[in-house]
């Protein structure tokens, strides 16, 4: 249960960090435009088919120093894969420790040590066999 929660939190953090990065735009020739999403490609195709000029608004965000996309992408993937490997290895250790505690068996003074419950519970049937009810 907690492993699933950790994975969901990790995915949420990764999604928000990816959405927080500005979209890198490539400077192309004067006649060409950079299309960053498929919806923009469809919009541009529709406007060209109708014969209307497509006007693109520029964002008012300040220009940041842009690293080469390949280096930035490679570094972030390496960091994320390293983080994920550490998280998985730490979770495997705790799962193994917990599973060995259960695989050792029950102590002799445990309440159901004399019964044949091997990983399943049979609620009601054994208690009904032990007691006779008057009809």
Swiss-Prot record:
Post-translational modification: The precursor is cleaved by proteases to produce a number of active cholecystokinins.
GO molecular function: neuropeptide hormone activity
CC terms in the record's Gene Ontology section: axon; extracellular space
Entry keyword Secreted: yes
Phenylalanine amide: residues bearing it: 123
Modification Sulfotyrosine, positions: 117, 131, 133
Cited PROSITE patterns: GASTRIN
One GO-annotated biological process of the protein: digestion
Keywords: Amidation, Cleavage on pair of basic residues, Hormone, Secreted, Signal, Sulfation
Annotated segments matching region Disordered: 26-75
Principal cellular location given in the protein's record: secreted
Domain of life of the native organism: Eukaryota
Name listed for the protein in its UniProt record: Cholecystokinin
